[in-house]
Structures are given as C-alpha cells and as structure tokens.
C-alpha cells in the first residue's frame, strides 16, 4: 500500500499548499498540532460499519482531526478458540483486503483480549507486535495481564506521547513502501531522555557529555540511535546539527550504515554517508557549516586527523562505547624492539579533532569509565526486561566441560589466565596480556587429545539436537580461544565429518537457486603468515562477506561457524540458537558473546550456551553486574532435567495401576475403558489427598 507511506509523510512532516491565486502566499499545512498547547480534535468511534469490497465493522477507531490513525481489534479472553493472533489476522488480512481505504491512513494498530494487549502496524509481523509497559519516564514496567492494557491506554495513548510516536517514531525506509517500523517503548523513552540530556549538556554552556544509554544487547539500540538522530536534526535550537555515528568495527559500521543511508527522508537530510577514509572524513567535516549524518569507525581518527571542527552543534553518537572510546590519556607501550612509544587513545584523538562536540554513548555493558567519558546513564533497559517483553529470548546454560578432559588442575591454569585478562571495566585495547598466561591457556585448550574429545562431543551434541528438532534451523557457532585452536578443530571435524566441508545447496528442494555452501566454515581474517591451506580456506574480504550473508540466510546450507573474535559482537542472526564456548571470556565481552543466541525467531523458545571451559560463574557474575541487580542466574539444563524427573515421578504415581499395554495395543473400546478406569483412579487419589490435608489442617 504505497499510499500509506505518502499519507504518513503528510501527517508527520506537513506539506505546502499552493494557492490558485498567485497573489496570495502559499500555506504550510500541518495535519496534527504537535505543540504542547494541543488544539487537535480526538474522537473515539465504536463499531463503525465500513463498506469496501464487503462490509466490515472495526471494534474501535481513534480519529485525530478526522483522520483514522489508530484502529483497535478486540477479542474475548474467555473463548479458548479465539486468540490474539486472530485479531492480528483480522486487521492485517481481512481488513486490508476488504476495507483498504481505512487502513491506508493508519499510524498504528492495537490488538487486545484485555489480558494481552499489543501494538504494531499493518506491515509488522505478528511476532513483532509488542506490549507498551511503561506509562512515564522513570516509572516501573507494568507487571502483566490487565495492567498492560491500562498502561498501553495511559502510556502510548497519552495525547503527548501518541503525537510524538506518530510524528517522530514511525519510520519508512527510503527504498520501501511495505516496511513500516514503529518504536518499542524502551526505544521511545531512551531517545526522549537522551535528546533532553544532550540539549542540557551542549557546549559552550554544558560539558559536552550527552549521556550514556544502557540497553540490553538485542533490544534495538541502532533504531534508538535513528529515532534520536531525527529528534536532533529537526530541533531548530540546534541549527541543523552534524551527527557523527561512530563504531569500533567495520562490520558494525556496515550494519549501521545500511539503516541510516536508507533513512534520508526520515532524517530530513540527503547527506547521509559512510566515511571510508581519513581523507574523506577530513573533507566532509573540516569546512562543513551544518547538517549531514556521517558514519565511520573510531580508527579513522588517527594521529594525522588533527582539528576538524570547533562547532558546538556536532553530536557524536558512539555504538558499543565501552570497548574502544574511553581512553582520553596518552599511554606508553613497548614495541617488538623494546622501544617505548607514546600512543594517544582513540577517544583523545576524537576529542582533539572535535573539541566542542557533544558525545553520547550507547552500550549493552556499561562500566564506570563509560560514564566518565559520556556522562551519567540517562536510561536503562536490562536483559531481564527484554526477555519479559518478548524482545529477546531466554538463554539456557549447559555445562559439558567435564566431558572433554578438563580437570581441576587445568581449570586452575585457565583461572590464572583470567587474572591477566581484561580487568573489569578495562578496555581490551588498553591491556597487554601476560604471554606466559596466554601460552598456558592455549596449551591446555589446544591439547590434541582434548580437541579430539571436544570435536567428538560437539558432533554428538549437535547431531542429537538436529535429530530431536531442538534447533529451529540448525545454526550454531563455536567460539575457540585462538586461531591455531580454531584451525586444528576445523581439521579434526573435517576428518570426522568430511561431508560437512563440502559445498552443497540446502536440502530444501525449494532452495535450488541458493548458493552452494559447506555446512561447516572457519571464519577468521587471514594473515600473511598463514600456511597455504589455511590462507586459501579463509579467503578475502569479499568471501567473508559471502559467508556473512549465507550464515544469516536461515535456509542456506551454512550451519556451523567456527570463530575466534569475529561475529561474537554486533552480529545478528535471529535463527542462531546454539553457541558452544571453548574460550575464556568474561565481563562485557561475555555478555556480548552469549547474546548472539537471544534474538527472537519463529519457533525459537530460548538460546542455548554450551560450556566446554567452565564459565558459568563468570556468566552469572557478568549478567548480575549488567542487569541492575535484577537477575537470578541463567537457566541450567540440569535444573530442567530435575524438574522433568520430578514430574515423571508424579505421573508414575498417578498411573500406578494403569494398564498401558491395553491402552496402546487394545481396540477402541478397550482403550476407552482403560482411560475411564484411570480417570476414576485419579479422582480417588485426589479425594484421598484432600482428606489427608483436611485431617492435617485440623
């Protein structure tokens, strides 16, 4: 429905009205009054009959200034055969087909059975309809049930909030009229809080610390950045600011660039560009008086960049700010020749280049230094909240270290390695690891006999999950401790399962046009010192991009990725549901890594982390630290086994005298008879239990 996009642009942006009389000045029309002194006319209409190809009666329509912008479909919670998804289908299929003239005006759709209430758009998949669980900034989320209905009505449909959502938080990509993205409540409150904080901290009056946003990995921080950027770009007080979005890795830069360069209309600026070189960065920023949205990596700010601009309306938004953009000092390092060299941190170089800019940090794992550089946390959205909202799935833990010859002495060696690893709150770019500790760790984890045991157990575990249909698409990632270990493991798996490394098309007959791919691939950047076989296997940058695309393709034959550092942060594959970890990781890096399996995907109930090294305590400690104290630990498969065993014992007691042979092998009459017999036995047992309880109570 291309008209929907155009109508929304008129509603959100307004439009000029040209007079027939050239002597009269043209008018600029705004369909919605966005000022606080609200002059809009709101009307709720119930059960309005609308005739299109057939007659339909939407339950509720909210009109603003005569425009049907919010459409409700309600279902009863007392009829088991009527579901919330039925309401979704009624709006997005039947109403779209039969009364499309109504739907082309919609800003958002709401479905509710009073217990469950969600919102989305005509183009939103059902699994991405979410609840609005917060009324106002700083308040707690609604617990659930009826509370979520009232929170949606008093929060999302609050006049001021609804106006803002309609005009600033609905986004159509430039190249599509069939994609319409609407904010989730944490994105709305985060963008609003950051926007106000930036205004208060702008230089020269402020300190240039725009604030830190702590958002759980997978909660959609890149869209929060997009929403925030629009608010900044349209603010007259900022005089057409220049926005610089900074990441620390090329793949993250590519992902963010893909969103922003397709949002020029939404951002109200045609100059939205990815900066690929230092020279281009200098050219774009040095003499620019205003405007523009630029995406780059922090590494572009090298020693030679020097001063780029002294303007005060430059906003630098840093993605994953905890990793590389904290060092404001000069550090001294020893090179391979034993010479002492002075090196300026990326953060210092960035601020030297743009001394009067305001800096904003986005992170899923905030540390103290993040707030020292970017300012206090202005809004928070934890992993626990994300799971409760259905934005991400739960992560389940399974320990298998005992199965791969990792005894307590070797675990002690790995613990010694941890002591030399990144200390909590430190950046990996600031720490020189102990060579001895690293060597000991690699000797333990790379032991040939151990790797054989790991490979054998991995194959058994992975194939069992495939057989049991415990994985939605068979996508798995194996994290190794070093390049050498990853290469050795790949060769062992190739020897044990040679067909895994042969390029094939997906087994699905409908995928004949897909690119052939091996089931198992080693994903690393090759180096000049790699041997010929490894060098050829790893391929160049274009080959790695192909692997990236294939792994993200749910139905491609590429199912298992062996990695060391690549793809463990900022790499989204919603169908990925199994991660095998054989690498010492802790703190924010561990949270970022395991979050690869927490994305929502149809049929995916949880993400599984399989531990070959013994990181359970590190996982619980890290998540406890980064969850605002609202986390009770990872679910463990051993706990599930205990629960199932307990339930089986209860069932065994209930079915103690049940004739299973007659039930499974008898004729229909015999099956019915034994079922009734069991039902009577169950009633008798329940009656005895109740009598015992009454006797005990008296």
Indicate where each model-derived feature is located.
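ATP-dependent helicase/translocase motor core
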Residues: 1-247, 251-267, 289-293, 311-313, ...
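Interdomain helical connector at the RecA1-RecA2 junction of SF1/SF2 helicase-like NTPases
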Residues: 142-143, 371-473, 490-491, 495
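Conserved helicase ATPase motor motifs in RecA-like P-loop NTPase domains
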Residues: 216-217, 322, 342-370, 390
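Inter-Walker segment of RecA-like/P-loop motor cores
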Residues: 261-307
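Conserved C-terminal RecA-like helicase domain
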Residues: 436-563
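Long, hydrophobic alpha-helical segments
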Residues: 601-697
